[in-house]
Each structure stands twice: as structure tokens, then as C-alpha cells.
Amino acid sequence: MKTTIVLVLAFSAIAATPAQAQLGGLSDRLKQAQEAKAKVDKFDLRISEADERKLGEEVSQRLCQEFGVYQNKEVARYVALVGRVLAQESSRPGLDWQFIVLDTDGVNAFASPGGFVHITRGALGLVRNEAELAGVLGHEITHITAKHTVRAIQKSKVVSLGASEVGSSGGLAQSVVSRLAEAAYSNIINNKFDRNDEVESDKVGIGLANKAGYAPGALSDVLKRLEDRNKNQEQPNGMFASHPLITDRLENIAKIIKDDKLTASGRVGTRYTKFITFEAKPLSEVPVIAGARGLTGGDSKDSKDAKATEKKAEPKKKGGLLGKVGLTSGSQAQNTQTVASAGARGLGQPDRDAKGGTNPNKVDMTVTAAEVAEFKKGIA
């Protein structure tokens, strides 16, 4: 396993010299600095599949801690079966895929590197049939198979490594994985993937749904419902809040279905409503928390205080949500303060900042290949 290390370059100050000599020395040093920077720009942070898994597991734990895990085993198994049907059609079927239902009324979904897909209880309530669920899960699966979060981290170079931070087996040290997880969590929770990443996830995701027998256009139905849900919101909110605009995505999905001749027609509404017996709450009824979720990995003082006092007072609204791999304008502390202040003014986005449950433990269950094969027979 090879790991390329991003070098952190430091240049000493120029000692006092005669003017002419100093100018010459400055010119030489400037040239050296330019050459060194060009060399550094060629370096990349290599994240192995094992490192990706560790990274994704840590991010998943943070999501479960932040939102809680819905403890209904039948619902958890059902979502996992739909997800596994899609995952086996993907370019990375061998990943140890996990599909987790988060215990929050907010309508959202998150893809964590290495095979961890999360969908909220609120999102399940918004979806109307299995094909729509497949469209959502297929989109999130593609973020993972295409390594969108991993590549965003690599491009941003938010973490610089020293030789001591490479593990004894050649992988990344745990301290580095934790730093990467902080950046990845911010990227995921704030839901601002690159435009091309979103287009790819829509295209490949509906392709996976089609291969499994689900109607690919079902994702468009979810998007339309989301558009109506958020029509009075000033900013993008919750699931699929990233650009491009929903109207553009709808047009693109229709074009993909036509050009790629995607003709599957399975909707599977009856089986869906057998397991998902609840509906999404209107935005006005979704409780939100105070704090700066996403800017500090969900562990800000405001967030902790809100959780500690949420039973004593009505939760305050807050801002927050995705930025590109944790990169923000200004210092993190400044951004945290700004978001918290916005929350104090009553500015918040319910789906994005929804209060979660208190149990972070994942539902203990196993889904076998035979169960997946049998489940797939019901797609019609």
C-alpha cells in the first residue's frame, strides 16, 4: 500500500545582508519557493479502501450520535433490503454496505464513505413507494461508489501529513482519519456536493434503480415533492439541497431516461406502505436544534447545550449545513458564531437542522444474499 504524503514546507526568514546581495538572495528564494509549491501541488493524499472504510465508519458514528438511530427493526431491515438490491448492481458490490435509518423528522439522506448510507425517518415518510426509495438510495450509493467525498477531501488538501502520521502498515494513522472525518462530516451534513457529482449521482443512481427493476422516473416524483415542501424556504433545505436546481435535475433525469432507454416500471407501493406507515411532518412542525451543526462536526457548545436543555424549553432554530469538505470563508470560530446568531434570530431550516433521537446504536441485524434475492422477486 502506497501513501503519498503532502509536504508541509516552511521557509526561514532572510538574514540581513547588503542590499544587492539581499535582492539576489530574495530572487533565488522566490524561485525556490515557486518550484517547491509546484512540487507540492503534484502531491496527493492517497486514501486506501481500508482507510476509506475507517473514515466512513467514523463519519457514520457522528451522524448516528447527532440524529439518533430509528430502532424499528422491521423498518431497518426493509430499507437495508432495498439498498442491498441496488448495491449489488453498483460498481462496488463487494463493500460491506450498511443502510441506517436516522431517527429525525427532518427529510434528509447522507452517504458516508466506504459503504454507509443513511436516510431519515422523515425522508421515508415523504417517499410514497419502493421505487422512490430506490431513487434516493441509488443517488446516495453513487456518492460512495464514485468516492465523491473522498475526492473532494483530496482536492481540497485540508489535511497535511507528516511522516509520523502514516500507520505502521502503510495506512493512515487514526489521528489523521479523525481529522479527515471532521472534514468529511462537514461536507456530508451540509449537503453541497459539486454540481458534476450531483449530476453523476442522479444518472448512475436511476440507472441502478432501473437495473433492479424500479421505475427510474420515481426519483423525479420525490424531487417534485421536495420542491413543493421547500417552496417558502429562502435557502436550499434538507435532502438534495445541493445544486443544480430541482427544475434542472428534473429535465436532466427525463433526458437520461430517454437517451439511455431506461424502461423498468416497478413501483412497489403496497410493500412500501406495509413497512412505512408514517408520513413526513410539515416543515412548520419539524423541531430544530440550536447550534452550528456541520461546522464543528456536530459537537459545538451550542449544540450540546441545546440537547441538554431541550426538555426544558422549546428548541431554538439555527443555521448550518454543508460546505465543501469543511472549507469555509473565514475561521471556523467566526462561522460558528455567525450561524449560532442566525439561529437566535429565528433563522433555521427544519429539514437540515432537525432535532434527532437519543439512541445512537445501530440496529443489530444481518441481511443475507438469499434474502436479497428473494426480496428482489417482489419488484414488479
Regions found by a protein language model. Name each.
Residues 6-15:
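Bacterial N-terminal signal peptides
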Residues 18-380:
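A Zn2+-metalloprotease active-site environment signal
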Residues 1-4:
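Positively charged n-region of N-terminal signal peptides that target proteins for export
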